[in-house]
Amino acid sequence: MFFGLILQKFWHTIDHEVGAGILRLRFNCSEVMKMLNIVLVEPEIPQNCGNIARTCAATGARLHLIRPLGFDISDKAVKRAGLDYWHLVEVIDYENLEDFFARNQVEQMWCLSTKAPRSYTEATYQDGCYLFFGKETKGLPEDFLDAHRDSCVRIPMRECARSLNLSNSVAITVYEALRQLSFPSLTDYGKMRG
């Protein structure tokens, strides 16, 4: 809600305790939209997390990490994959899903799963919605999917393929949500030389 009320541009810096260290997060609070929320439930591969952080930086999405993680957030592979975009990403971590729901008021959520009956393009994404993605090897927990059955969507693919890469799935879904919202606060034009 705080981000939706910001009308003038300023930078905000927070210190976030991660394990034994402090991760300094600096992000631009100039956006007037609530922003999308990417929720990674027990991600295992640091490079995926870094790539997803870069997608968040480019789109203004907030990144939520649900523990246990398969890596240390300060891992070099995470930082390398996110390049020099970390200062543009708001990252919040949680002990578990219960901790996440206790700390967030989720008005709309979509759970991405290969088991879902309908396509992610059939969903109507609202500003501030939460997009849940499971761990690379197992996806979201079955009981979680059962509890949120009406919010489950999938990315279509060939039947012989098990799944898409996690960071690719996040990017595909985030950009569909942003397309439906008319790419708020994003530059959708460029200038070619010559």
Where are these regions (language model features)?
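Post-transcriptional modification and biogenesis factors for structured RNAs
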Residues: 8-19, 23-194
